[in-house]
Amino acid sequence: MSEIALRLQDVHVAYGNSQQPVLSGFSMSVRKGEIACLLGASGCGKTTVLRAVAGFERLQCGEIYVSERRIAGPGVHLPPEKRHVGMVFQEYALFPHLTAQQNVAFGLRRMPREAQQARVTELLKMVELHSHANHYPHELSGGQQQRIALARALAPHPEILLLDEPFSSLDKRTRERLGNEVRDILRAAGQTALLVTHSEHEAQLMADHIGFVKMGQYQLKKAAHHSQG
């Protein structure tokens, strides 16, 4: 049986002084190397799951573990930079004044320069944008920007990669193509990932398993039916 890479146990999250929690008794797990997906309507709490795992939201109760290391729970709230978690956002969040390779290198500033450059080159080749290394974000298409954002998130070798509706701003044809590309990149890297989407087609395209989120709770898990060939 493969190792559990991410585990949420009885997680409760509420915003501000709200008496109604966004997440209520939320529990789930993701195995190492698996691409899991949370599927649900807007406002169901699925993005809050990512924010809680990333360290952007504090838990009212419950626990979160990454590779059996507790990162959140009673008396514990590791800051985002110490969680070994990467995140790809809807809006890419690239730095406009940095080139593609500088964006990818941003989280590697403590790495020796030679090793940093080798890692950046490896990732730019992986996302097939090595020839665009010196391009600025405004010189790249939406799909290319998202691949650079993916490379940047993968650069520091995160234990878990979180993807929050990563293709929602793209047209249908580009979403389909990029979904296939990102899935293949994650598999090639052996990367454990948790994707959030409201699109069942996108979930089926990318994920090994799909969990449904309703009213802040994890409802059901099923295997996706996409071909891995």
Q: Predicted segment positions?
A:
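Conserved H-loop
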Residues: 190-198
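Conserved ABC ATPase signature
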Residues: 136-140, 144-146
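Conserved ABC ATPase "signature" region
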Residues: 69-72, 114-132, 183-184
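Catalytic Walker B motif of ABC-type/P-loop ATPase nucleotide-binding domains
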Residues: 161-165
